[in-house]
Amino acid sequence: MTNKSIWHKNIRTKRGKELKEDIETNILIIGAGITGLTTAYFLKDKDVTIIDKGKIGYGKTAFSTGKVTYLQDLLLKGNKGNEDCYLLSQIEASNIIKKIILSNNIKCNYESNFSYLFAENENDVKKIKKIEKILNRNDIKFKVKEDFQGNHYSIKVEDTFVINPVKYLLGLKEKLSKEVKIYENSIATDFDYKENKFITKVNNNYIKSNYLIVTTGYPFLVSLGLIPFRAYIEKGYIGVMDNDKNKKYNAISANGNESIRFFLDDSGKEYMLYSNFSDKLYKCMNNEDMTEELKWKTKAVYNKKISSIYSNTDVYTFDKIPLSGELYSNLYIATGYSGWGLTNGSISAKIISDSINGYQNQYKKTFNPNRKTGIFKGLLHNMESLTVYLSSKLKKEEQGNAYVYEKDNIKYGKYIDSKNEEHIVYNKCPHMGCNLTFNNVSKTWDCPCHSSRFDIDGNIIFGPSHYSIKVEKKKE
């Protein structure tokens, strides 16, 4: 069984250009995922530079399910008074993605299908009934299905679709490559504002810009929106299984716990993608238990064996609406997609680009990153996270072939691989100082506080940290 994303199967990409000199640009976008590339697409005629700390197509978007639908559990979660606005934003986002794919002939396994929202219990039925009212008052057609896979109740809409998100990103990158300056493996570590210019440090070089847009999923500096105090991170696992028939639907449960979609690859092979659980990150650090539960569920319910399994994390705001737009004058952020990165990332790109272009946008106020977002809930969550932070400082862990030890008042992590070779790293996340937990499933060092991930040699895989935890070997 592998722990790689299904979307990377048979993907070959060339090494991207790396920033190695000081440059000046009108608009600098940090983060070349769904939001960054879509924003660049809308602003491509305005002298845009986009940078990414790694390879494009290997960030958070690559570990999504690739469903594009507005029939979401988030329609009821937290955004009281904004349900209609959120629904319409997701419909517009779906249309944005569809238009980009079709008008640019992007080959990304685009397939029209329909979406189910299903109830697993009577309480879920009540939730769906409320969502029906939201759909009705916005003239959105849906159908009721009393028995969907043995569940209590479900509704479906027909104008949704699925894609291979990695191919979509790479298609966007190719489309933009002649109109936008793109740099990969180029890490932004800090920025300043002087003489009406943003000055961003990247790979020990500097980029001057009039506008700065941060679309890194989780902003790389705490000062960018104070996200650790306004949102939290959830983690879940996705299981990939062989499937014998291409089914033309995707589905989620009304409580948001279960997700199903099907994927037909270029060779005609059919897969089923399934996830059944996500929770706050610090509650999900026992990776082996989570994967075993997922394997048990797929075997018990679908009689299928998982061939590949991988995890993903996302930033959740307390009102379940993204923090996207202008944070300060000419400084923009986009984060907090609450599990729906393809649609929320795309509509965030439209909000930001409309603002820079001087256009009105009906979602600007609702998505405003400066709005109040559950301050009390944020304080409560941070008290819980503080407990995790303190316990991470106190405990010595031993997980399979990895353990944490202390030497000269410095904590280290050691992993011994199948060849009996030792891989030693610093056991402290450079972002905010949490100690790391070894993930036996993905063979990575994971941060339980804000989801930074490092490989066994300390190289950074995911942020918000922008520094590695590598221990430099002493020369003999």
Residue ranges, per PLM feature:
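Helical element adjacent to the flavin cofactor pocket in flavoenzyme catalytic cores
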Residues: 133-134, 155-211
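Extreme N-terminal leader/targeting segments of oxidoreductases
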Residues: 1-27, 45, 459, 467-473
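N-terminal Rossmann-like FAD-binding beta1-loop-alpha1 element of flavoenzymes
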Residues: 25-50
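C-terminal catalytic lobe of FAD-dependent flavoproteins
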Residues: 159, 255, 300-381, 424-425
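Active-site substrate-recognition segment that forms the wall
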Residues: 68, 104-111, 206-207, 214-330, ...
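N-terminal pre-ligand scaffold of iron-sulfur
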Residues: 359-442, 468-476
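Rossmann-like flavin
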Residues: 81-175
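Glycine-rich FAD pyrophosphate-binding loop
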Residues: 45-63
